[in-house]
């Protein structure tokens, strides 16, 4: 059943997939829509959950509006309230995963938040592990230029999304988590295909930096855990059953 929730004057499209049991709120990635979750939502219903998926502002059938993390979290809160979701598990992919991680910092009652392969983009030379200072500076400059060129012609609201991502310190967000937070990584090598060959070493260096930062966070006393799946950037589309098993393992430990 598809409905609308108005959050701060913005209509937010919401799809309740039915089912009974633990509520699960599903957040899609940037430039995508709630339909990405259809197959996974069906699996959740069959395993005793009630999944609800929403279109983030500016996406799918939701209204376009200024974009910020605070406004996105307000939209999520409005959906939770209007649909009567009780302490929902919040699972997000990419952009939605970052929203889920921020939710974890504000909702200690949340049983689990999941960031599914939402690692952001490199913005500083120190994020290119294994490259010396000069090569790291060059890698950062070339990567920034490439990503900027990719953004040409995109609508302003989406460019604002990208600026919000670039300004977010995800590892500070992880360290601020107040409920269990699972960060899931796909195979970063599969994502390297979007870059020209000259930038693949830089991308790999950034992925190495990300893994090391995640290892540091999970070694600290914190509610953050990390897991990997042998998929690309879209585990919920490529292997939804593997993602379900991972989720069940977190919520129903043996």
Locate predicted features:
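Conserved HGGG/HGGXW glycine-rich cap/lid loop of the alpha/beta-hydrolase fold
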Residues: 13-61
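Active-site loop/oxyanion-hole signature of alpha/beta-hydrolase fold enzymes
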Residues: 42, 46, 53-91, 231
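Gly/Ala-rich beta-loop-alpha elbow adjacent to hydrolase catalytic centers
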Residues: 92, 96, 100
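Flexible "cap/lid" loop of the alpha/beta hydrolase fold
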Residues: 101-105, 110-142
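Active-site nucleophile elbow and catalytic-triad environment of alpha/beta-hydrolase enzymes
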Residues: 156-173, 209-212
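Short beta-strand/loop motif that positions the catalytic acidic residue
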Residues: 177, 183-185
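Conserved loop-alpha-helix segment in the C-terminal half of the alpha/beta-hydrolase fold
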Residues: 187-231
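Catalytic active-site module of serine/aspartate enzymes centered on a nucleophile-bearing elbow/loop
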Residues: 221-254
